[in-house]
C-alpha cells in the first residue's frame, strides 16, 4: 500500500481486543485507510454508522474489526441456542460473500469465533452441516439466508451485530424485500450494532438505514473524482473487423500481469474468451451461465496467478474483489455510465497504478458522450496502425468442448498454454511475438 492510500491512524492506538490486534499485526495491517480511521472510533463506542465508501477503500476490514470486537466485548445472549448466530453480514453477491469470509478467517483464527458462509449455487446439505455445528458470525447472500431461516435451521433472535454491505447494489439487484424480511426477525435495532456501507448514500439507502438502524452516524469517504488518478485511461476507435485483432495485439504489447476484459453480453464474452484461449493465453470466462463451483475455481486461479486474463460480463463480475489487477480492457463500452467506473475501478487500487483501455466501435461508440459527461473528463484518444496489428492469429477455441487426455490445440503435454511456434505464453515470462509499439498519439 502506498502512503497516499493510508491515514496516520494506527490500529494499535484503538482500544481493540488484544487477539484482534495480534491478527491485524500478523497480517501486516498497521495503518488505517480513511474509512477505517473514521468509522472505527464510532463503532467501538457501539454506535451505528451508515458509511459511504467505494470498493477497494478498506471498508470490509472496518466492519469486520468492529464486528469481532463487539462480539468479544459483549456478553453472549442468555439462553442462546446453537442455531442462533450472534452477527450477520449480508452481501449482494456470492463472490463478495466469499471474499468477506476469507478476510474474516484472519480474525477468526485468533479470536475463537466461528465463521459460517451460505450462498446460492452450492449444496444446501454441505452448508447446513456447518450451520448445525453453530456459527458466531454468519456471512451470506440474502436469498440463501432466508431459505435457512424459513426452514428453522437459522434463528436470528440472538443477533448482536449486523452488516449490510454494498446497499446500493442490493437495491439494484432487487434484494430490499429480502433485507427487510431478515431485519424484522432480529432483535430491536437499539440492542444490536448496525453497520451499512454503500458506494452512494442515496435517499433510498438512507431510508433503509433509518428504518432498521439506531440513529446511524454518516461516514463519507467520497472520491474527488469518479475515476482514480492512478488509472491511465485511453480509448481506441476500431472498426468491427479490426476489433478482435486490436485486442489481441494490445494484450501482446502490454503483456499485462493480471487483466480483466469486459464485454456487454454473454455471447461476446464467449467470443473474446475463445480467441484469447486459441492464442495461447491463460484465460478464464465468467458469465451468468458458468456454474458456481467453476466460477469459484476460476476466481481462485485468477487470484493465485494461474490465470492471467479474466473475461467477464458486468453482472458476473459484480462483487468481485481481486487485488493487483494491472489492466482493464473494455472490449465493449458499457451502456451504463456507472458500469464504466466500476469496471476501471478494479485496477489502480490501494495507491497502485493501473491501465484502462476502451474500444469505441460502431455498435457502442454512442455510449461514449454520456460516459465522459458522467466522469467529467474526456478519455484520451489513442490511434493505431492497422498494418501493425497481429495477423498470425490461431483459430478460436470452441467454448463448449469435451476434455480428454489428449493435448489440446495451443497446449503442451503439461497442460500449460503455448504461444506462437510452441513458445509458452503463460506466466507472463514467455517470449512475445513482437516489440513494435502499435499506439500512436
From Swiss-Prot:
Placement of sequence motif Q motif: 9-37
Protein name (Swiss-Prot/TrEMBL): ATP-dependent RNA helicase RhlB
GO BP, sorted A to Z: RNA catabolic process
UniProt organism field: Shewanella woodyi (strain ATCC 51908 / MS32)
Catalytic reactions on record: ATP + H2O = ADP + phosphate + H(+)
Chain span(s) of sequence motif DEAD box: 165-168
Region spans: Disordered: 401-441
Similarity section: Belongs to the DEAD box helicase family. RhlB subfamily.
Keywords of the record: ATP-binding, Cytoplasm, Helicase, Hydrolase, Nucleotide-binding, RNA-binding
Chief localisation class: cytoplasm
